[in-house]
Regions:
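Cytoplasmic C-terminal tails of single-pass
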Residues: 272-282
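Bacterial N-terminal signal peptides
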Residues: 6-16
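Generic hydrophobic/packing signal
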Residues: 13, 102, 121-122, 261
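Positively charged n-region of N-terminal signal peptides that target proteins for export
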Residues: 1-4
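A domain-level signal for the mature, folded cores of soluble proteins
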Residues: 20-99, 105, 109-250
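Membrane-interface motif at the C-terminal end of an N-terminal transmembrane signal
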Residues: 18-20, 264-271
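Selective detector of the "anchor" transmembrane alpha-helix that sits immediately C-terminal
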Residues: 247-268
Length: 282
């Protein structure tokens, strides 16, 4: 990957795509708000390639990579690493991290937004999306870069950690670079964006592949990916910054009680079966 990215960085510098696409793609390019203490802020492909020994780093200014796919606008964001631990053994960190913000158009007007979050996504009517200068605002969770419509704390299923998207970190309006299935050259790279490889430990993750090879049809079927997203249900948070903590915590307690009941009921039936003589036995 290092050699390929090095070549792509040089070639991209010589045959660079337009830095911004006039019109609707540029108009809706998102404003990105990091969480406080974010160790790996939004970057660019050239800056990421610069992490490889012997390759000059590109501009430090963050970039979003935009494309129009039929009635959808896609904005891809690259981060040098995902640094949020997961699971009981606290694994899950990996080099390289791609995230996606997607907008549904009706004519030239955005009507729906879909933000990627871990292995899924959240969908919301565009009129409910917070905006800055007419652009959608994206709040990133610390370490994981899961994208949210409002800042706050999200309670995730134990043992995974909560998502902290407090909106108090770096706020940027990234430069927009247009991409397609063939340009710039790095879009054709079929390897992994990073050296991390998952081992046998549960929760370990390999570095991701690029936008065109993302799972769940992100690139090839934007509408299908959006249809699978969960609808946004709460766009406000309490004074402590908790956006869904109470509901999720209650669901976790109910699930634990249900599991305990199932175990006790199963043990009771087993004892009854052991105490009952077999048919025909005298």
């Amino acid at each position: 990957m290092s050699r390929w990215l090095a070549a792509a960085a040089v070639l991209s510098a010589l045959v660079a795509p337009a830095p911004a696409l006039a019109g609707v793609l540029d108009r809706y390019a998102p404003v990105v708000v990091h969480a406080s203490g974010e160790p790996d802020a939004l970057t660019s492909v050239r800056a990421f390639a610069g992490r490889v020994a012997g390759v000059e780093p590109g501009p430090a200014r963050p970039v979003v990579y935009g494309r129009r796919a039929g009635r959808w606008l896609q904005y891809w964001m690259l981060f040098a690493a995902s640094s949020q631990d997961r699971g009981l053994v606290r694994t899950g960190r990996h080099e390289g991290d791609w995230e996606l913000v997607q907008l549904r158009l009706r004519g030239r007007r955005a009507v729906r937004a879909v933000y990627s979050q871990h292995a899924g996504a959240e969908s919301c009517g565009y009129r409910f999306v917070r905006k800055s200068g007419g652009r959608p605002v994206v709040y990133l969770a610390r370490g994981s870069h899961a994208a949210y419509f409002v800042p706050g704390l999200r309670d995730r299923t134990w043992p995974d950690p909560n998502d902290e998207a407090d909106g108090r970190g770096l706020r940027v309006r990234p430069r927009l670079v247009r991409i397609s299935a063939g340009r710039p050259p790095w879009i054709r790279y079929r390897g992994r964006w990073g050296a991390t490889r998952a081992g046998w430990v549960p929760g370990e993750m390999s570095s991701p592949r690029g936008p065109t090879l993302q799972p769940d049809g992100h690139w090839s079927d934007p509408g299908g990916w959006a249809a699978a997203a969960r609808p946004c249900t709460r766009l406000d948070c309490n004074r402590r910054g908790e956006c869904d903590g109470r509901e999720t915590a209650l669901a976790g307690v109910l699930a634990a009680l249900g599991l305990l009941w199932a175990l006790l009921f199963g043990a009771r039936r087993m004892r009854r079966a052991q105490a009952t003589p077999a048919n025909g036995g005298h």
